[in-house]
From Swiss-Prot:
Keyword Ribosomal protein: yes
Protein name in UniProt: Large ribosomal subunit protein bL27
Matching PROSITE patterns: RIBOSOMAL_L27
Alphabetical UniProt keywords: Ribonucleoprotein, Ribosomal protein
Organism listed in the record: Citrobacter koseri (strain ATCC BAA-895 / CDC 4225-83 / SGSC4696)
Cross-referenced SUPFAM superfamilies: Ribosomal L27 protein-like
Biological-process GO terms, alphabetical: translation
Gene that this sequence comes from: rpmA
Length: 85
């Protein structure tokens, strides 16, 4: 008779759920006030005109308009603004 001993247990086999981070509304897109523009960890993008920054660094529109991405300042920071139409 063929015999096989029981395999040992493992301590691996877990992973965290994906957090669905990233840009949700791209440059030139029209957004309404309250729309989420970017979900991020830390400030990869900074809040510009008519954009608010949430507790978890989520950027959201404070007014209706078009999304505008821009790089400015001495450190070449990326800013996101909402331009009224």
């Amino acid at each position: 008779m063929a015999h096989k001993k029981a395999g040992g247990s493992t301590r691996n086999g877990r992973d965290s759920e994906a957090k669905r981070l990233g840009v949700k509304r791209f440059g030139g897109e029209t957004v309404l006030a309250g729309s989420i523009i970017v979900r991020q960890r830390g400030t990869k993008f900074h809040a510009g005109t008519n954009v608010g920054c949430g507790r978890d660094h989520t950027l959201f529109a404070k007014a209706d308009g078009k999304v505008k991405f821009e790089v400015k300042g001495p450190n070449n920071r990326k800013y996101i603004s909402i331009v009224a139409e």
